[in-house]
Every structure is written in C-alpha cells, then in structure tokens.
Amino acid sequence: RIDDGLSGIVRMMHRAVRSIIPQEVAMFDFLKQKDRTPPVLPEGTVRRHFSISGQVQGVGFRYRARYAAQALELTGWVENEDDGSVTLEVQGDPDKFPELFAMIQRSDYVRITDIRQKDLPPDPWERGFSVRGY
C-alpha cells in the first residue's frame, strides 16, 4: 500500500509546513508594496512620460534608450506603439534627460521629429530600465 504511505507523508509534511508558516502569511506578501514604507527617492527625482514620433521604430531606438538610461542611472521603460511612435517613461535627475536623448540620437537611423511630454508622479518602487513589447 504505497499510496497510503505517500498520503501519510504528504499529510505529515503539510502539517509541519502549516506549523512553521501560519496560514495568514501569504507566500508573496513581500510584494505588497502598498503595505510597506516606500523607499526615499533622491531629492529632485522626476518622472516624465514622452511620446516620440519620427523614424523611431525598426532603428534600434528602444535598445539605445535602454543603454543610455542605464549609463545615466535613470529608470523607466520604453515601448513601440501601433501608430509608429515610441513611448518612453523615464525617472531620475531631470538634468540627465537631455543627455539621454542626445545618446539615443547618436545614430544614423534614429530621426526624432516630435516629442510630447508630461510629468508624472515618481515611482519609488521602480528599479532599472526595461524594453517592453518584444
């Protein structure tokens, strides 16, 4: 009766785990950021949403943006849009934003014709810079 033996072992392990980890503690509670005190952002941190038009898709724009943002210690993300534009959200020292765009445009292929922007509240939980929409 192997099944009875395994069932007994499983029940025993389940009881042991329940005694160690109370049921009210969820496995991913550490991800509930709203329940934790947010990290303190450096003074002057800004988050900005950019909608960028021009020759910005199929030319390495997103990867150049990621490289530049990481080099400048900025966080955020970049994503291609269906209308041919690119959306870029960047957070950090706003004095570095012009250099970010200068680094992105150091390409024979990227041509920015229009940039629309709006300020957003900073996200204290954000870490790193990602390329969305592979």
What residue ranges belong to the model's regions?
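Extreme N-terminal basic, low-complexity initiation segments
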Residues: 1-13
